[in-house]
Amino acid sequence: MKKLVFCDIDGTILDGSRKMEKLTPETLHAINSLRRTDYVVIASGRCMGLLDRQIIDLDPSGFILCNGAYDLVGDQTVFRDSFSKEAVEKIREVTVAYNGFYIFEALNEMYVDSFDSDAFQLFMSGWAKVLKGFEESKVADKPFHIAIIGFCDEDSCQKAGEQLKDIADLARHKGFYSYDVNIKGISKATGVNRIREYLNIPYEDTYAFGDALNDLEMLQAVAHPVIMKNSDPALKTYGFEETGDVLDNGFYRYLLTNKLINPL
């Protein structure tokens, strides 16, 4: 029976915060091996337009994008959902009230309210070249699948999060005053379940690898959840099996040790 492996990107097979910006030969071998014999799905909070070319070039079996709000197997869309107009307006209103920035993501395009705000410069300035300005007249009919909001201080971040928790599901970014803002009830687990059903894979043959709180539901939705040694401490409290650090090819090493792939 084929296995179905879900793999996060940031902190799991890449780590830009620690200058690991290219996939290692071991990771490339692992994903190529799984793609030939089983199924491997890249699971990300990002939209397609924010994925590195090296990730797209992996040509995995599928993608979970926008933390589960847009899910693909090959070229087939198996699930998608978007924010209501009311939710978009509430997220904008609360974020601005606390001097934050917001980014709304469609499948291939991202829109930011201000390139000049202090909060944006603090957290997201490196993304400026791939973002567009949020102009209401131009985005009125855009389907947005996820948002990112960020602030200048902890107090603003916490208060904004409290005001939004009833209309969206928020996942805090480790080490930053910012969140992924997900459609209420949607998570990477949504993609796991839709893709597993589409491919008709038994639960006992499912695996997931992650390192952050936006991976929690995905990890809980599979039979074999695995977290990285460098995971958010909050994720480690759930008792998931742990593999090595991303810098030590933890993803590859787990697959090799458990005989899911052959050595490089």
Positions of predicted regions on the chain:
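Asp-based phosphoryl-transfer active-site loop
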Residues: K3-K19
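Active-site phosphate-binding/coordination module
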Residues: K22-D118
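Conserved acidic, metal-coordinating active-site core of Asp-based
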Residues: Y98-F101, E105-A221, N230
